[in-house]
Amino acid sequence: LRCKKPISFLLALDIHADVNKAAKRMYLTSHRPPSVFMQCDTSRNIKNGEGLSAVEEAFKDESLSVRNKLLLDMIYDRKKKLPKAFSKIPPLYKGIAKKGFDIISSQFSVHYYFKDELTLRSYIQNLDENCKAGGYFIGTCYDGMKVFQQLQNAPDKTNLEMEDEFGQKVYSITKKYDSEDFTYKQTNKEALFGQEIDVYMSSIGQTFTEYLVNFEMFIDIMKEYNFEPVRLEV
């Protein structure tokens, strides 16, 4: 991670165990900010440990959350007695997340929260609780409306696919929903959730189920939590 202003602290959360590999890669780099990596379901409350408990429940492994709950107590400065083993953790971690973060980044994951409205709102509640006033949320995902329109115009109305110059598949998107309209109106929020697509990316080598993101609706719901879209000069 490089930027003009040094990063003072990084909290990295992912529901998958791949976060442990990311932690190792970070540890092996020479320029690394103070960091904490955790396996956590960010569609559940982060601060109170629900996200950790959800992972423990899903993977049937209590050890996944025991250490992480202690780390949460430390970084959110909850006045709890910590085990002796934690005494060597640098003091700068204590309470470092209590006042929130300047930037929250969600790369190629926003679409998963559009499974249903409760899942999305639970995630946005995490953003609201952890982003400082004046801070930024940055996210990356497909434009759901563009994907919807391209699937409508596809020869079989169901599949989009791109191949490279050697005929190897680069990506594919397969429609799994039945909806014929993805237009946002404030009265039809419920109908825009759960619009499933199967996505294959050659760089990952697997197919994952994702959900179309209607940006108009997303912006509207984010505004309820005091987030406003910002156009940055690049």
Please identify what each model-predicted range represents:
Residues 100-102:
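Local beta-strand N-terminus motif with an aromatic residue
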Residues 140, 144-225, 230-234:
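SAM-dependent methyltransferase
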Residues 56-92, 158-186:
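Short mixed-charge
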Residues 94-98, 111, 118-136:
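A short glycine-rich, Lys/Arg-flanked "PGG" loop and its adjoining helix->strand segment in the class I
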Residues 43-44, 110-111, 142-147:
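Short "lid" loop at the C-terminus of a central beta-strand within the Rossmann-like core
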Residues 3-87:
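Class I SAM-dependent methyltransferase SAM/SAH-binding core
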Residues 105:
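A conserved beta-strand element that flanks and buttresses the S-adenosyl-L-methionine
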Residues 2-3, 15, 23-26, 49-53, ...:
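Short coil/turn segments at secondary-structure boundaries
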